[in-house]
Regions:
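Structured surface interface patches that mediate subunit assembly and partner/cofactor docking
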Residues: 2-11, 26-35, 58-75, 95-99, ...
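Amphipathic, well-ordered alpha-helical segments in soluble domains
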Residues: 16-23, 52, 103-106, 110, ...
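Helix-turn-helix
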Residues: 33, 39-42
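Charged, glycine/proline-rich intrinsically disordered loops and linkers
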Residues: 71-89
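A short, structured beta-strand-centered segment in the mid-to-C-terminal lobe
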Residues: 83-103
Length: 210
């Protein structure tokens, strides 16, 4: 991954899992029912990240079998998310959180051996290592959601590396001129409030504590 060492990406991944679990520890019994991400409650959010971690295992299984095609299109993400939440509707927030941590850490343990394997995800075909940055970003963004539900902010320890690594994945997933231009702009973005840029790109509004 140009410019972002593997160890940095994995550290950000581990940090995202840890910080999400730590944020959940701050929730009261009633807090699990409060809105945390759009129409999703904190419980819904825990179920969502559990489902996403499961997808990552499934996609890596496909990659190991030699299938690097996208599992479904990006336009299907909303429907896939809704279906996954329905499937986990009987699982409480704390239980979903505990299962997420175990599943996410197990995925991380698989990554090192498969870092350069071609890997399909909804936005295209990259490598498992490039996609690891997207996974790290997913955990940090949803940590931000939980922390804001608690009235606090969240920022990853190395926002510039997270921005660069996720940008490298997005650029690799694009084809032709668009991908090349995106790759050229990454170094500039790392110096211009990278975490705020990630938040805004995901539809979130940075606060004073971010």
């Amino acid at each position: 991954m140009p410019g972002v060492p593997r160890d940095s990406v994995l550290r950000l991944y581990d940090e995202g899992v840890h910080d999400f679990a730590a944020a959940a520890d701050g929730l009261s019994a009633e807090g699990w029912d409060q809105l945390a991400c759009g129409e999703w409650t904190a419980t819904d959010l825990a179920r969502h990240v559990l489902a996403v971690a499961g997808w990552y295992h499934d996609w890596l299984d496909r990659a190991e079998r030699g299938d690097a095609s996208p599992p479904f299109g990006a336009q299907e993400l909303a429907a896939q998310n809704a279906e996954a939440l329905r499937a986990l509707s009987g699982l409480g927030g704390p239980e979903a959180m505990a299962q997420f941590v175990a599943r996410a850490r197990a995925y991380r343990d698989r990554l090192s051996a498969q870092w350069d394997v071609p890997y399909g995800y909804p936005r295209g075909t990259v490598t498992a290592g490039l996609h690891a940055a997207v996974a790290a970003c997913e955990w940090h963004l949803h940590t931000w959601d939980l922390m804001h539900a608690l009235g606090r902010g969240h920022r990853p320890s190395d926002a510039a590396s997270l921005y660069a690594a996720t940008g490298a994945c997005s650029a690799a997933a694009e084809s032709g001129l668009k991908g090349r231009v995106a790759a050229m702009l990454i170094p500039l973005g790392t110096h211009l409030r990278p975490w705020e840029a990630i938040l805004r790109r995901s539809g979130r509004a940075p606060g004073p504590d971010d």
